[in-house]
Each structure stands twice: as structure tokens, then as C-alpha cells.
């Protein structure tokens, strides 16, 4: 049986909160999320910024800096509206014996 890894869930929650702060503070930003689910080993939040990119104040820069440092991977995509950053937390699940369901990225 798989259980959610509390450490990974804490990291995902922190990502959601930081992304939510940016979503509230920056006009026209779109927040998307893919919460943990048994069928996936990852969970992610994404922020789509319209271009040209808005001038970001220090609070927003600090939240973005946290997002980049707290996730396992960041994917950047060009969209019709602008640019989208997807921040992902890996290895969201553990088995009953405490083993993670996926190997660390450097082993795969």
C-alpha cells in the first residue's frame, strides 16, 4: 500500500502557498496545480505569466526564489499568453515499509 510522504507533502504545500501569493499579487498571472494522486509520483504547481513580463516587487521575487529552490525540477514553457514555469516535487509516495516508490532522479 502506498502512503503520501509527509516531507514531500510539506514541500508541495509550501510551493502551493508561495505560488498562491504570487497569483494574488501579480495581475493576469494564472495559477495551475496538479496535486498528489496515487497514479503519479509527482505533484506540481505552475504559474503562467503574460508577456511582456511585469515588473516584480521584492515580495514576489522572494516567493519566486523560494519556488525555484524548494522544488525538484522546474520546467519552462512558452505559451500563447506568455511564459509558464512548472515547479515539481518528486517522490510523493512511500510504501508501507517506508521505501519511496521511485528512485531518486540521479539514479534513474
Regions found by a protein language model. Name each.
Residues 58-67:
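Short amphipathic alpha-helices in soluble, non-transmembrane regions
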Residues 33, 69-79:
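Conserved short beta-strand edge segments in small beta-sheet-based binding/regulatory domains
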Residues 77-107:
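C-terminal edge-of-domain segments
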Residues 1-32:
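N-proximal, solvent-exposed amphipathic alpha-helical segments enriched in charged/polar residues
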Residues 30, 44-48, 75, 84-90:
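Ser/Thr- (and often Asn-) enriched beta-sheet segments in non-cytosolic proteins
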Residues 27-55:
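Short glycine-rich, basic-tinged beta-strand/loop micro-motifs
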Residues 51-58, 92-98:
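Short, surface-exposed beta-strand/loop "edge" segments at domain boundaries and coil↔beta transitions
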Amino acid at each position: 500500500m502506498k502512503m503520501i510522504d509527509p516531507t514531500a507533502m510539506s514541500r508541495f504545500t509550501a510551493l502551493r502557498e508561495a505560488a498562491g501569493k504570487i497569483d494574488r499579487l501579480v495581475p493576469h498571472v494564472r495559477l495551475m496545480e496538479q496535486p498528489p494522486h496515487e497514479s503519479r509520483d509527482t505533484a506540481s504547481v505552475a504559474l503562467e505569466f503574460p508577456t511582456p513580463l511585469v515588473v516584480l516587487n521584492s515580495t514576489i521575487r522572494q516567493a519566486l526564489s523560494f519556488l525555484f529552490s524548494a522544488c525538484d525540477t522546474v520546467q519552462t514553457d512558452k505559451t500563447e499568453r506568455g511564459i509558464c514555469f512548472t515547479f515539481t516535487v518528486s517522490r510523493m509516495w512511500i510504501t508501507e515499509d517506508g521505501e519511496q516508490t521511485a528512485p531518486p532522479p540521479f539514479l534513474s
